[in-house]
Amino acid sequence: MSKFSFNIHHQHKKARSGIIVTAHGEMRTPAFMPVGTRGTVKAMLPESVAETGADILLGNTYHLMLQPTAERIVLLGGLHKFMNWDKPILTDSGGFQVMSLSKLRKITEEGVSFSSHINGDKYMLTPERSTEIQYLLGSTITMAFDECTPYPATFEEAKTSMQLTTRWANRSRNAFVKREGYAQFGIIQGSVYEELREQSAKDLVELDFEGYAIGGLAVGEGQELMFKVLDYAPDFLPQNKPRYLMGVGKPADIIGAVSRGIDMFDCVIPTRAGRNGQAFTKYGTVNIRNSKYADDNKPLEHDCLCPACRNYSKAYLHHLVRIGEILGSMLMTWHNLTYFQNLMSRIREYIKLGKDFDFDS
């Protein structure tokens, strides 16, 4: 089994490209991770996701702990076997979903007590329990438990939240079972305050995680402020370890973040947009529901090799989406995931060639 490692092959200014080696294979960076929240990327077969060029998926601890439960998944051979995906899987800690989905929740030093959004059952999620669940799932990359600081937050509110995340990170690290080829990432917080981001990074670097995520962005602060944070936050992190920007997935945001030193991304945007009839193309977004596509016999993109573009017209996709056929969601999602992986491939090629990004989609 391979050791977990991050090898930077090319660098242009702050942008890096390379390979992350894991127990479940290699992943190219910069990487975009399709979101498989409940053990599936919606409207896609696992092998179809792989065909788009994805090297890694994201799973969600909160949803999987509720249904079908981590204990059931481990009895069935782990998440990789359960969902028939043999490449790396990163699982988030569940903290963000607890904060955003659970109406009845209480944050204490111990963790977060909450009621399930499904049936109202009461649960307690702690750094130790979150780490245990991810271990049972067999996650390649485990995320430390954190509090995602809401935006806007005052300096004092952000400081209190960041310090709690640091204490939880320490407990998450102590609970993590180290195995060859597996990793745990810490999450730095601090909202939009440079002093807090620097302190958070300093505290977490001392815990020697295998990689680091920048959390608490893309929560309403806007691109300008997000980029302002990214102008300095990655520089507080080790050069030789992966940097993951959580929940960011607009093409222009990805390109801007890579140019500031980010290596990994995840977002529901391509899959959710696909199911809602929106396609990403290098010429901009296409709302396939628009009546102007009803008689359009051309593909979404002439040079895209996904099945939606190879085999079907915009008129057919328009028809499927307008009548709510499942195939419409499948084809639109396949196209969008292909677009995002092609974008990452193009980004990696530009870094290899030492070229500035002259595109934003």
From Swiss-Prot:
The active site is at D92 (proton acceptor), D266 (nucleophile). One of its GO terms (cellular component) is cytoplasm. It comes from the Bacteria. It is an enzyme of class 2 (transferase). It catalyses: 7-aminomethyl-7-carbaguanine + guanosine(34) in tRNA = 7-aminomethyl-7-carbaguanosine(34) in tRNA + guanine. Binds 1 zinc ion per subunit. Zn(2+) binds at C304, C306, C309, H335. Substrate binds at D92, S93, G94, G95, F96, D146, Q189, G216. Residues 247-253, 271-275 are annotated as: RNA binding. GO terms for biological process: queuosine biosynthetic process; tRNA wobble guanine modification; tRNA-guanine transglycosylation. GO terms for molecular function: metal ion binding; tRNA-guanosine(34) queuine transglycosylase activity. The keyword Transferase applies. Pathway: tRNA modification; tRNA-queuosine biosynthesis. InterPro entries: ArchSynthase1/Queuine_TRR (IPR050076), TGT (IPR004803), TGT-like_sf (IPR036511), tRNA_ribo_trans-like (IPR002616). Its EC number is 2.4.2.29. SUPFAM superfamilies: tRNA-guanine transglycosylase. Keywords: Glycosyltransferase, Metal-binding, Queuosine biosynthesis, Transferase, tRNA processing, Zinc. Belongs to the queuine tRNA-ribosyltransferase family. Homodimer. Within each dimer, one monomer is responsible for RNA recognition and catalysis, while the other monomer binds to the replacement base PreQ1. PANTHER family: QUEUINE TRNA-RIBOSYLTRANSFERASE. Catalyzes the base-exchange of a guanine (G) residue with the queuine precursor 7-aminomethyl-7-deazaguanine (PreQ1) at position 34 (anticodon wobble position) in tRNAs with GU(N) anticodons (tRNA-Asp, -Asn, -His and -Tyr). Catalysis occurs through a double-displacement mechanism. The nucleophile active site attacks the C1' of nucleotide 34 to detach the guanine base from the RNA, forming a covalent enzyme-RNA intermediate. The proton acceptor active site deprotonates the incoming PreQ1, allowing a nucleophilic attack on the C1' of the ribose to form the product. This is Queuine tRNA-ribosyltransferase. It comes from Rickettsia massiliae (strain Mtu5).
